[in-house]
A protein has these predicted regions:
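Hydrophobic faces of well-ordered beta-strands that scaffold small-molecule active sites
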Residues: 39-41, 68-70, 146-148, 175-178, ...
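C-terminal helical cap(s) of enzyme catalytic domains, especially alpha/beta-barrels
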Residues: 283-298
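Metal-dependent phosphodiesterase/phospholipase catalytic core, i.e.
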Residues: 6-11, 15-26, 84-196, 219-252
Length: 298
C-alpha cells in the first residue's frame, strides 16, 4: 500500500513539474496581426529620412512595413512626444531636456536641422519638420502597429501612456511597449495589462541561462516579444543570440525581434536562424530582400 501511495504521489509530482516545463502558448490580439517575417522600421527608418519624423513614418508605411518603432517622452505640460534622445540637442536647432520643456517650446525648433544622410548635407533644414506628439502619430496612422519604447522614467509616464492608448482604442491589438528599464515595464504592465509588452532585460538573461538546460518554462513571462541585439551585455558578460534562445522564447507562441540590422546578408542570416522580426533603419533594404526572396514573399 505504501509503495502504491509513493507511486501515485510520484506520478502527480511528475505531472506538476511537467506542467512547468511544457510551454503553454500565449494568445494576444497583437500577435494575430503579425506575419513572419515581421518588418519593423526603427525610428521610421532614420537612415532614409529624419529620425521619427512624419516623413520617415509615412515612407515606411508606404513600403509595406508592418510595425513602426519610436521612443516617447513627456513635456512639462503633459504631452507625450516622440523623440529618441532625452534632449533635443542632436537633431534640432534647439537645446534642452524634453521633460523640462513645454509642447509650445518644442514646436518652435526645427526637428531635422542637424539630420544628415552623409554628414555633409542637411537636406531637411527649414522644411517645416517638427517633433511629433503621440496623438499626432495616432491621428495620422490610426490602424498602424506601434512599437513604443518608453525612454523617460523620471517622472514616470506609464499611466499617461496607458490612458492615451485606451482613449484612442489602440491598446489591445496595435501597441507593443518596450523599455530598457525593467521597473518601467513592470509598472506599465500593472497599469495596462491588456497591452503587449517586450521582454525585460533581467528576464532575458535568466531565460538565456534556463534555455541552456531546457528549463525555460520555469520562468513565467508576461512578454509577447523579445527585442534584442545579436550580442547583448549582461551581468554574465556578452551573450550571443542563437537558435536555442530563439526556440526557447518562441515555444510559447512568442516572437524574437532583432535590432538594429541594416545589412541584407545579416537580415537573411537571422531570418534563417528563426528570428521572427527585423528592426532596421533601412526598411527599403529589408522590404527588397523579402520581395525578392521566394521563401518570404507572399
Amino acid at each position: 500500500m505504501k509503495k502504491v501511495l509513493i507511486l501515485i504521489c510520484g506520478f502527480y509530482l511528475f505531472l506538476y513539474i511537467l506542467g512547468f516545463i511544457i510551454p503553454q502558448k500565449i494568445t494576444h490580439p497583437v500577435l494575430e496581426r503579425l506575419s513572419k517575417p515581421v518588418t519593423i522600421a526603427h525610428q521610421g527608418g532614420n537612415k532614409i529620412y529624419p529620425d521619427e519624423s512624419l516623413l520617415a513614418f509615412t515612407n515606411a508605411i508606404n513600403m509595406g512595413i508592418q510595425v513602426i518603432e519610436f521612443d516617447i517622452h513627456r513635456t512639462t505640460d503633459g504631452i507625450i512626444v516622440i523623440n529618441h534622445d532625452h534632449t533635443i540637442d542632436r537633431l534640432t536647432n534647439g537645446t534642452g531636456l524634453i521633460r523640462e520643456m513645454s509642447w509650445v517650446e518644442l514646436q518652435q525648433v526645427d526637428g531635422a536641422y542637424n539630420w544628415s544622410p552623409d554628414g555633409l548635407t542637411y537636406p531637411y533644414r527649414d522644411k517645416g519638420i517638427k517633433i511629433l506628439s503621440l496623438i499626432e502619430m495616432m491621428d495620422a496612422f490610426p490602424q498602424q502597429l506601434y512599437d513604443i519604447e518608453i525612454k523617460q522614467h523620471d517622472p514616470p509616464l506609464e499611466k499617461d501612456l496607458c490612458d492615451l492608448l485606451r482613449k484612442y482604442g489602440v491598446a489591445a491589438d496595435q501597441a507593443i511597449v518596450a523599455s530598457f528599464r525593467d521597473e518601467t515595464l513592470a509598472r506599465f504592465h500593472d497599469i495596462c495589462p491588456e497591452v503587449a509588452t517586450a521582454l525585460p532585460v533581467n528576464q532575458g538573461t535568466i531565460l538565456y541561462i534556463l534555455s541552456r538546460v531546457g528549463l525555460e518554462r520555469l520562468l513565467p513571462l508576461d512578454a509577447v516579444v523579445a527585442q534584442l541585439p545579436t550580442t547583448f551585455s549582461t551581468k554574465l558578460g556578452q551573450l550571443e543570440l542563437d537558435r536555442r534562445y530563439i526556440n526557447a522564447f518562441a515555444k510559447g507562441n512568442r516572437q524574437v525581434w532583432v535590432w538594429t540590422v541594416n545589412d541584407s546578408i545579416e537580415m537573411k542570416r537571422l531570418m534563417n536562424m528563426g528570428v521572427h522580426g527585423i528592426i532596421t533603419d533601412r526598411p527599403d533594404i529589408l522590404m527588397d530582400l523579402i520581395h525578392h526572396s521566394k521563401e518570404y514573399a507572399n
